[in-house]
């Protein structure tokens, strides 16, 4: 954590384009949703030019599926950030480096390298992403009773100057003490209290008082 940030407030990895870029370990913008003005990667010009996103993934709209593959990236294009400026995708998330004045200006201006800073979203409230993430984290942790990990997407409308937030996944984070070392295949069925083919993962919950088992045979919600 930086400055007055707290570990429990979490961090977010932001990137232009499809999420595969983040999954593959691409250079993302890391920020705490409770402190959107404190972004280490954009705190100095040299750091911003060196430590921000330079490429992104986009769908290859010319690929009609003739070379369909199990590779999840077969119909994706990896493009330089400047390519996204052609369709207005950078309007609210990029800044412009001015090599003459040696400064990075929030927003899109002619010429100059485009730097993915999300400044208009994080600092100028074009879209309330930090607040939305705070609420998702708050409600998610309250319901799951532990820190959560989320995946999300946002589309920003340049003409209407608004956007849509999509919550793609939310799951509990398993801490170190919940690591499972037991080989479940070695446990006999007669020694098992409950067994399921579907689960959200393993963990330790120390506040459980009761376990209710519902027989699904003949059960209806009206009962």
Q: Language-model features: where?
A:
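Conserved mixed alpha/beta core segments that line enzyme active sites in large multi-domain catalysts
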Residues: 1-223
């Amino acid at each position: 954590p930086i400055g007055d940030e707290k570990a429990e407030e979490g961090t977010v990895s932001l990137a232009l384009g499809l999420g595969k870029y983040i999954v593959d370990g691409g250079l993302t913008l890391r920020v705490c949703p409770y402190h959107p003005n404190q972004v280490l990667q954009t705190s100095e010009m040299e750091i911003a030019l060196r430590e921000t996103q330079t490429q992104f993934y986009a769908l290859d709209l010319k690929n009609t599926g003739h070379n369909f593959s199990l590779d999840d990236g077969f119909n994706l294009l990896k493009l330089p950030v400047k390519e996204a400026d052609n369709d207005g995708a950078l309007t609210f998330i990029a800044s412009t480096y001015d090599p003459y004045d040696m400064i990075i200006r929030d927003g899109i201006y002619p010429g100059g390298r485009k730097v993915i800073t999300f400044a208009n979203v994080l600092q100028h409230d074009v879209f309330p992403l930090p607040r939305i993430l705070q609420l998702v984290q708050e409600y998610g942790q309250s319901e799951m009773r532990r820190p959560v990990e989320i995946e999300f997407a946002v589309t920003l409308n340049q003409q209407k100057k608004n956007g849509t937030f999509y919550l793609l996944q939310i799951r509990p984070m398993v801490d170190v003490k919940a690591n499972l070392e037991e080989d479940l295949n070695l446990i006999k069925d007669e020694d098992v209290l409950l067994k399921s083919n579907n689960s959200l993962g393993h963990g330790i919950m120390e506040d459980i008082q009761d376990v209710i088992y519902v027989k699904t045979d003949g059960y209806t919600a009206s009962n």
